[in-house]
């Protein structure tokens, strides 16, 4: 497969603050790439560099196997993007807003606007004023604008941010359909891991400006294991009891005191009985399987991604 995006040792520094630190990622043709991290991790800064909105402090970007800086105009013609909240004229309809954008982009294709509105499911809402759109409809209109010029690469920055579960489901389905039916390569940033893991082929996890891991999602799933999750009153005593009574050493203790026990899954009741007999308060005990959320927590060494 051809590499659509190649980023090598990319850094963006503002004074003494390093927003993105020596980042390297690769996105192959046809992939949906999940660029994941907490708010403020460096996702949007990276995307702005990819789109030429800000200049890197150092590093190299290749898109469509061409150096970005020296081929910027040509490359950007084949990229569609939605960065943060899409901006439109509130007192114009969806169709009127897209007509203005089509003129700016120099799009001559007669039915381009109708086509993208149909793709994003807004054909029946094209004469509704933008100010009367729901947040989910506004996000879909932003994606429609990004598709107007039939790009090869689509970059979406937090497209499900602030949406209700129905809106998230609609955007997720739309992204899947775009990748499959139009063979578009998609880079999507998010902090909502449960939604992203249903979409992506490859994952890049960024934290405090540093890429912690880049992995194919299928390989990540193979790493997932079942574990017993226990919340208790005395972590040190529990660790001692697990080691001396059951020979359990394959466990982790999270910052919030939760135990993750990766062995002896079938002995959950015996473990619970041992703890209670030793005056340990057991607030919660359940068997869970690792997913992208728990994988992220383990990588960054603490709380959830929000």
What do the predicted segments below correspond to?
Residues 5, 12-188, 193-207, 211-213:
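ABC transporter nucleotide-binding domains
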Residues 226-299, 306:
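Short, charged/small-residue-rich alpha-helical element at the C-terminal edge
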Residues 172-262:
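ABC transporter nucleotide-binding domain
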Residues 76, 98, 114-117, 169, ...:
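Generic structural signal for individual residues within well-ordered alpha-helical segments
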Residues 1-11, 302-306:
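ABC-family P-loop ATPase nucleotide-binding domain
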Residues 29, 106, 124, 234, ...:
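Non-catalytic surface loops within mature trypsin-like serine protease
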């Amino acid at each position: 497969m051809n590499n659509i995006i190649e980023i090598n040792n990319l850094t963006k520094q503002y004074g003494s603050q390093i927003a993105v630190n020596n980042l390297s990622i690769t996105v192959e043709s046809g992939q949906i790439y999940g660029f994941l991290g907490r708010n403020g991790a460096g996702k949007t800064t990276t995307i702005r560099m990819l789109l030429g909105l800000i200049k890197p402090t150092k590093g190299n970007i290749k898109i469509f196997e061409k150096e970005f800086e020296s081929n910027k105009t040509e490359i950007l013609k084949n990229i569609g993007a939605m960065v943060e909240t899409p901006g439109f004229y509130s007192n114009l309809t969806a169709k009127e807003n897209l007509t203005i954008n089509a003129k700016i982009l120099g799009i001559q294709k007669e039915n381009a606007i109708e086509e993208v509105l149909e793709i994003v499911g807004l054909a029946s809402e094209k004469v509704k004023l933008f100010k009367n759109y729901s947040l989910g409809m506004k996000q879909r209109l932003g994606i429609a604008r990004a598709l107007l010029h039939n790009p090869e690469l689509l970059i979406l920055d937090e497209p499900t941010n602030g949406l209700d579960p129905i809106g998230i489901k609609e955007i997720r389905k739309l992204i899947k359909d775009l990748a499959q039916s139009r063979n578009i390569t998609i880079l999507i940033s998010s902090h909502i891991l449960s939604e992203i893991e249903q979409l992506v082929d490859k994952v890049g996890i960024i934290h405090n400006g540093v890429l912690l891991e880049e992995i194919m999602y299928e390989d990540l799933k193979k790493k997932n294991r079942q574990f017993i999750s226990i919340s208790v009153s005395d972590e040190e005593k529990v660790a001692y009891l697990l080691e001396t009574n059951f020979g359990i050493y394959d466990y982790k203790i999270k910052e919030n005191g939760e135990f993750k026990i990766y062995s002896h899954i079938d002995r959950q009741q015996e473990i619970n009985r041992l703890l209670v007999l030793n005056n340990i308060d057991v607030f919660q005990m359940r068997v869970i399987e690792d997913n992208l959320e728990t994988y992220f927590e383990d990588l960054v060494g603490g709380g959830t991604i929000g």
